[in-house]
């Protein structure tokens, strides 16, 4: 994600995934799944590392983290994030595998862009993902964690989610530029599949 010259890396690709991580300079990293206690990018003091619950502000961007306590354990922490950037409200559901608690849902008002897992087990199943989209009613919903060439872990094709949601607006693109004025009147939710 980029706002001007400021770049945020969301859920960096692990080398064990079988995928090649993109190479670019970033200013902040947000991880929705962290070991506990958290491990940060060693030797990269200028990088902003975000982990866990709380309110953060960097480069005029407001971020709130909500720990998914029913899915966290002694050794790892799952967090859902709400980010306000350039007047647009984003929500990153990350590695969740079940519906969100009422407490977290209450903190996610006015979501413009929802980024959510859509590849099924071990994360959120497609039916629950569709229910969450209908509850949150974002202007844009972006599926993640689905099957792509080279991925070593189990995941289902994004087509399974697309069949489940039966959306009238679906866009496939390599890169997405979002401006507040362009999405203000977007209804129903537009599904955007980022391709690699």
Language-model segments: residues:
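Pre-active-site segment of Zn-dependent metallo-hydrolases
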Residues: 2-49, 67-76, 96-107
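Ligand-binding grooves and catalytic loops that recognize ribose/phosphate and carbohydrate rings
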Residues: 34-45, 132, 136, 153-170
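Active-site-proximal loop/helix segments of hydrolase catalytic cores
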Residues: 72-136
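Metallo-beta-lactamase
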Residues: 38-79, 83-87, 169-179, 184
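Active-site-proximal beta-strand elements of phosphoester/diester hydrolases
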Residues: 7-11, 62-69, 80, 89-95, ...
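Binuclear metal-ion centers of metallo-dependent hydrolases, dominated by the metallo-beta-lactamase
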Residues: 75, 140-196
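Conserved acidic residues
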Residues: 25-27, 112, 139
């Amino acid at each position: 994600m980029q706002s001007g010259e400021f770049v945020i890396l969301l859920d960096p690709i692990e080398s064990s995934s079988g995928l090649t991580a993109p190479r670019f300079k970033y200013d902040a990293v947000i991880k929705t799944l962290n070991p506990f206690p958290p491990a940060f990018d060693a030797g990269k003091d200028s990088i902003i590392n975000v982990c866990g619950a709380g309110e953060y502000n960097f480069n005029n961007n407001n971020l709130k983290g909500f720990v998914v306590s029913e899915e966290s354990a002694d050794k790892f922490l799952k967090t859902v994030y709400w980010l306000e950037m350039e007047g647009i409200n984003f929500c990153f559901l990350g590695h969740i595998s079940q519906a969100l608690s009422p407490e977290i849902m209450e903190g996610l008002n006015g979501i413009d862009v929802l980024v959510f897992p859509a590849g099924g087990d071990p994360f959120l199943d497609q039916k629950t993902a569709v229910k969450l989209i209908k509850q949150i009613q974002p202007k844009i919903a972006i599926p993640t964690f689905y099957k792509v060439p080279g991925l070593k872990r189990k995941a289902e094709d994004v087509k399974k989610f697309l069949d489940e949601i039966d959306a009238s607006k679906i866009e496939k693109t390599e890169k997405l530029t979002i401006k507040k004025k362009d999405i203000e009147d977007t209804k129903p939710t537009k599904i955007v599949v980022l391709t690699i």
